[in-house]
């Protein structure tokens, strides 16, 4: 059996959820969209089912997968509905919906739901991606109330730069939201992962922890006690001696500065490890750090074993996890941890805890 695998620590997931809820102080929807950021939505939701106040997913199909897996807590559709027929499924499966644009208001106007809808009304407070502008928010809220088809309305927004504590954008968005919603009743939800950890003023009724659940800290240089949930690992499957000056791999991107003992590892970019990382990117072999050498290929990558004389065939190689933070690999690849985690595929997933 190929040794490439993703080890998912469900105890760490629960730890991170409790940390998020404790830091925020209110209720928390665990965000498990995009297959729980690549970790397995059904497995992660089941692991949190006894603790979570609810879950958030992207769209209806993701919610139905959770219901089929036995999840009966509230589930919020962050993108809302796309067509009138979806409202029947929303009611049938007791789902909550975000309303963030006029077409969704029109869908509700023309619907005849069997039960009142639970709506989260989204304001565009400055991210300019989704939501009603400040002057549109009260009319949208009133239209929902007057429809007679809505039960509760939670007011929400989303921050563009909560993971940048030195910039004013989050404060400006907070001010815009509070000004626009001052006279409107109902619960509020503002805090994403960055705001949970770094912006206490954004702590209201509901938090929406996402990336922090999976142990990738969104805040720079601030140890927050998160535990990595995924360890991406494989093993050394061959060892080769590379003479000083000899090239290695596609494009001869690496030339040995000295006689080099190279370990071939059964994992590549088809498994989700980024091709863009440079020579020198850290890996851990049997818990000891060394470096990537040569270009990452589809199924394989190569590491430097020269200074690890005890390492060899079968040695465990951690690409990210407890020894190698996924944020470090994301930085090397000039991307974000979200993308790396969501892209893990083809490897064997093993769950513990």
Curated annotation (Swiss-Prot):
One of its GO terms (biological process) is D-alanine biosynthetic process. Its cofactor is pyridoxal 5'-phosphate. The modification N6-(pyridoxal phosphate)lysine is found at residue 33. The active site is at residues 33, 250. Keywords: Isomerase, Pyridoxal phosphate. It holds the Pfam family Ala_racemase_N. Substrate binds at residues 129, 298. Pathway: Amino-acid biosynthesis; D-alanine biosynthesis; D-alanine from L-alanine: step 1/1. Coiled coil: none annotated. It comes from the Bacteria. CDD domains: PLPDE_III_AR_proteobact. Its EC number is 5.1.1.1. GO terms for molecular function: alanine racemase activity; pyridoxal phosphate binding. It catalyses: L-alanine = D-alanine. GO terms for cellular component: cytosol. NCBIfam families: alr (TIGR00492). Catalyzes the interconversion of L-alanine and D-alanine. May also act on other amino acids. Belongs to the alanine racemase family. This is Alanine racemase. The gene is alr.
């Amino acid at each position: 059996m190929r040794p490439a695998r993703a080890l998912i620590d469900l105890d760490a997931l629960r730890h991170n959820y409790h940390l998020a809820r404790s830091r925020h102080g209110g209720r928390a929807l665990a965000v498990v969209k995009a297959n729980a950021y690549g970790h397995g939505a059904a497995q992660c939701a089941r692991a949190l089912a006894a603790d979570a106040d609810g879950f958030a997913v992207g769209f209806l199909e993701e919610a139905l997968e959770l219901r089929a897996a036995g999840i009966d807590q509230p589930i919020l559709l962050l993108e809302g509905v796309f067509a009138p027929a979806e409202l029947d499924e929303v009611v049938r499966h007791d789902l909550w919906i975000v309303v963030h644009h006029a077409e969704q208001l029109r869908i509700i106007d023309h619907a005849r739901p069997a039960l009142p809808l639970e709506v989260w009304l989204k304001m565009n407070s400055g991210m300019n991606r989704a939501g009603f502008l400040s002057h549109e928010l009260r009319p949208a809220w009133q239209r929902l109330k007057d429809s007679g088809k809505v039960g509760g309305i939670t007011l929400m927004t989303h921050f563009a730069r909560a993971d940048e504590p030195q910039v004013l954008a989050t404060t400006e968005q907070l001010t815009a939201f509070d000004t626009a919603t001052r006279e409107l009743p109902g619960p509020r939800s503002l805090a994403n992962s960055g705001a949970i950890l770094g912006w206490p003023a954004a702590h209201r009724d509901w938090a929406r922890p996402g990336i922090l659940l999976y142990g990738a800290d969104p805040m720079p240089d601030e140890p927050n006690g998160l535990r990595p949930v995924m360890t991406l690992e494989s093993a050394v499957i061959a060892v080769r001696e590379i003479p000083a000056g000899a090239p290695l791999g596609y494009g001869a991107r690496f030339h040995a500065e000295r006689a080099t003992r190279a370990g071939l590892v059964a994992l590549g970019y088809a498994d989700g490890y980024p091709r863009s990382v440079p020579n020198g990117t850290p890996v851990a072999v049997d818990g000891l750090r060394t470096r990537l050498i040569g270009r990452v290929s589809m199924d394989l990558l190569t590491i430097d074993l020269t200074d690890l004389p005890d390492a060899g065939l079968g040695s465990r190689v951690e690409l990210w996890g407890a020894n190698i933070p996924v944020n470090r690999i994301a930085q090397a690849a000039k991307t974000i941890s979200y993308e790396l985690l969501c892209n893990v595929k083809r490897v064997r997933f093993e769950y513990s805890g």
